């Protein structure tokens, strides 16, 4: 009986190990663009491929974004959620070219 319970528990435990998290299926992008500035405390505007794009900024990245000068070249890494919202993962200042 103990072996059966242990076997079932182990099978149940291991079945959860292969479940992909929601973040694994979210499309990720890395693009160069021009940082336009903050739209509000949690959104930045970046020109990507000549089009102004709004990207949501998580709390841990807000200070980093606020320190960027407007109209500077940046490399942005972001995800696109199912509802179309873009979420910033990283932003790096690039030399103007």
UniProtKB/Swiss-Prot annotation:
Residues 1-16 form the signal peptide. It is a lipid-anchor. A lipid is attached at residue 17 (S-diacylglycerol cysteine). A lipid is attached at residue 17 (N-palmitoyl cysteine). Keywords: Cell membrane, Lipoprotein, Membrane, Palmitate, Signal. One of its GO terms (cellular component) is plasma membrane. It comes from the Bacteria. It is found in: Cell membrane. This is Uncharacterized lipoprotein YqiH. It comes from Bacillus subtilis (strain 168). The lineage of its organism: Bacteria, Bacillati, Bacillota, Bacilli, Bacillales. The gene is yqiH.
